[in-house]
Amino acid sequence: MRSDYRVYRYEHLEAPVVTAGSAAVLIGAQNGLFPDMGYTVSGEMGGLWAGERKVCDGFFFAIDDVPLTQADACEIHPALTAFHYRMQKEQLHVVRSQFIPDGVGGCVIELTIENLRPAPRMVEVSYTVRTDIMTVAAAHGEDGMELGRDVGEYDEKEQAFFARD
């Protein structure tokens, strides 16, 4: 069922926002960042969770080496969350949309970049993910496992990033 219902937020964007599917949840702030937050496990609630496993603390984009820091607006739909960035100096409007398909332990992220200059141009987009693989039990120190440093690599053939603890 398609819904045209949406909420736009322009103030108090430090408030939490959740993008959820049946197998994963992405928790961050309405400004598009992933601050340390959480009560059950202090400072560890934010990020991407797939079931009981925390996959990452957050992710970040940059356009032509200019980071997308705090969004100017948050657009909340029943099935997705979008963050609007006005890059005045670069004359760009960027929208980062994210949703979690049901049954998938991951997140789909889409960037829409609107060029506000009269002439066409190319931009370079970079993506950074901060992994923090753990279980809730491990974060509490209840499963006897020691939290280690995550190791990640990009597989060119699969065109995918893989990480492990």
Which residues fall in each region the model found?
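Terminal accessory carbohydrate-recognition/targeting modules of carbohydrate-active enzymes
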Residues: M1-D165
